[in-house]
């Protein structure tokens, strides 16, 4: 994944790339917790987090330099700006569709670094699955199938859709999901077209 990103950086004449989308952070680095950002340069990779996650980050990302921003800067954006200056980065790409104006202003406090907005770069990498990713998808499908087989037995009159969705999330974890799945929605009957509901089945 890093090789793909660095090839892109070279083609676009970028000295660095700043990653703030948590799914993309995980894809590039393998880091599974929240509150993490990456600054990738041509020769180094930095994972920016806060002290709560340092030990976890070191364990999961041994090839990364783990940096804590708290106490070193008012916010992550200004810390990333300082780091870009320190590393002598002249042009750094970032995920423009995820950045607030305030965050962008913080990045732009680096006087000698140009921040260049990009869109869908890492998502494009993610769209083509490696053999290892395909195997992981098969495992995920098996987990979902087993959880679905369990939830079928719980569907009966008087149980709410909200309760069933909660049980399904629980079964997913019990069957081997790394984390509680986000956004499970279980709806039946006449209200199926609604995204959120809690009526009884």
Which residues does each PLM region occupy?
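Structural motif
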Residues: 20-22, 49-51, 70, 94-98
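Terminal domain-start leader segments
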Residues: 1-46, 77-81, 85-88, 109-115, ...
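Conserved beta-strand termini and adjacent loop/short-helix elements that scaffold enzyme active sites
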Residues: 19-20, 67-71, 116-120, 182
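Short helix/loop capping segments that flank catalytic or ligand/cofactor-binding pockets
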Residues: 27-28, 56-57, 102, 194-195
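Compact, glycine/acidic-enriched structural inserts
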Residues: 51-68
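Flexible, acidic/His-enriched mid-domain "rim/lid" segments that flank
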Residues: 75-180
